[in-house]
Amino acid sequence: VDITRGNLNPLPLAVSPLSVDQNSKEKFKDLLKLEDIGVEISKVVENNLRQSGLFNPLDPKAFLQKPDIAHVKPRFEDWALIKAQALITGEVKIVDEKLRVEFRLWDVLAGKEIMALAFTTVSENWRRVGHIITDKVYQRLTGEKGYFDTRIIYVAEEGLKTSRIKKLAIMDQDGFNTKYLTLGNELVLTPRFNPTNQMVTYLSYFKNLPRVYLLDIETGIQEVVGDFPGMTFAPRFSPDGKKIIMSFAKDAVSYTHLRAHETGCY
């Protein structure tokens, strides 16, 4: 027997639009300018699962049961009829001026609930809630930790070819919620995330002198890593996030330095 390739069929599942009571829908519409926040969060989950390549979210037009099923047991025969093997349901509402999402994951073939969770956060985090839901569903169905509630740090470029402006930027893994972390006054290169917290290290040419900087994304506070007479470059965090390894050039010779950024010690 000659095996030439593997064949993976994405799991068909249904992401039912999260239900929203009318009062909450109107409030979210005023706050976020969204017609239906339940539909929008469900779209985030659906797109994430599809992009993973492991799941095949079914077209909502094929659903036989109405989306407003947050408080009732699904009619599993209806979902099995459209070939769904898993089903996500839930609701969104305002509680104490915050967004609260409750969702359930159902095994259609077994006819039972296999996960139920709830999240409460500020309304502006609605897209992140969609990513967190996806992470939980992904882990429950695959056994692997999800990666959807993550962000990407990168160098954004703009301007003419002869005078490019480079800014340090961050965005969600799906390309939304872009935020610029620097103004573009100095060249920035090689940003690297700390694996354990919201710190970033990167190279910046302040007054044409290459230096390694440390930036706290949440507070916006940045600092130079070390006070060296020469240039520093190529920063990396250690796997535990407690140290920074970087290169240091002096008198045409390059050295490697390891620095504990929490204490400032080498």
Residue ranges and their predicted role:
Residues 7-75, 88:
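Short beta-strand->alpha-helix linker/helix-N-cap micro-motif
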Residues 8-13, 52, 74, 82-87, ...:
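Extracytoplasmic
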Residues 70-136:
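Amphipathic beta-strand/beta-sheet edge segments enriched in Tyr/Trp
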Residues 91, 153-162, 200-207, 226, ...:
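Beta-strand C-termini and the immediately following turn/loop, strongest in propeller blades
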Residues 109, 172-176, 216-220:
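Short loop/turn segments that connect beta-strands within beta-propeller blades
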Residues 113-116, 176-180, 220-223:
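Predominantly a core beta-strand signature of beta-propeller blades
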Residues 125-126, 140, 178, 185-203, ...:
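Conserved beta-propeller blade repeats
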Residues 256-263:
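Conserved small/polar residues in nucleotide/adenosyl-binding loops
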